[in-house]
């Protein structure tokens, strides 16, 4: 069973190891339960590393009912959260894979969501837009482990 504290993960920099997409989603759901709103979470990792799987778990943990897919072609998708347990109303999912520069992200209006207390912003391929991220952003890096399903997940503050 995965039991995680965001604070302990950040303080001790101990990576979490998941052995399946289901475990990665479970980790994300645990993190979702600790979110208050206003957070920006940057996701870093190679293609197929588990970033979108993580967002799916985060969304489920926040009570999103819709199917969550990577917004590679639309760049940004806003999911409405109607779960009364949360003050968070919007999960903003951004995929920067196709961006050639940070300005392209500004052009879609993402800055209006940064720091909003009723929103959480999650950005795949965040390394491409690091210069735009708020200073207190959480950065989560995904690396492949010993087999094709294992992931080593490190959470840090930016």
What are these regions (language model features)?
Residues 51:
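Conserved lysine of the Walker
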Residues 12-14, 60, 101-105, 111-158:
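Short phosphate-coordinating micro-motif centered on Lys-Gly-acidic
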Residues 41-43:
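Hydrophobic anchor at the beta1->P-loop junction of P-loop NTPases
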Residues 47:
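The conserved Walker
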Residues 11-30:
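N-terminal pre-Walker A segment at the start of P-loop NTPase domains
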Residues 1-12, 80-90, 156-158:
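Short, basic, low-complexity termini and linkers enriched in Ser/Thr/Gly/Pro
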Residues 64-79:
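Short beta-strand-centered segment that lines the nucleotide-binding/catalytic pocket of NTP-utilizing
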């Amino acid at each position: 069973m995965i039991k995680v504290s965001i604070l302990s993960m950040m303080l001790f920099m101990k990576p979490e190891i998941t052995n399946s997409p289901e475990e990665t989603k479970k980790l994300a759901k645990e993190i979702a339960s600790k979110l208050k709103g206003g957070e920006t979470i940057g996701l870093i990792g190679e293609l197929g590393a588990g970033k979108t799987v993580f967002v799916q778990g985060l969304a489920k943990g926040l009570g999103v009912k819709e199917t969550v897919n990577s917004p590679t072609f639309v760049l940004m998708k806003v999911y409405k959260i109607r779960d009364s347990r949360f003050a968070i109303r919007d999960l903003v999912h951004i995929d920067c894979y196709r961006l050639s520069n940070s300005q392209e992200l500004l052009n879609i209006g993402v800055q209006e969501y940064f720091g909003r207390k009723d929103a959480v912003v999650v950005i795949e391929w965040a390394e491409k837009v690091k210069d735009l991220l708020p200073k207190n952003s959480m950065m989560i890096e995904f690396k492949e482990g010993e087999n094709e399903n294992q992931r080593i997940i490190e959470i840090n503050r930016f």
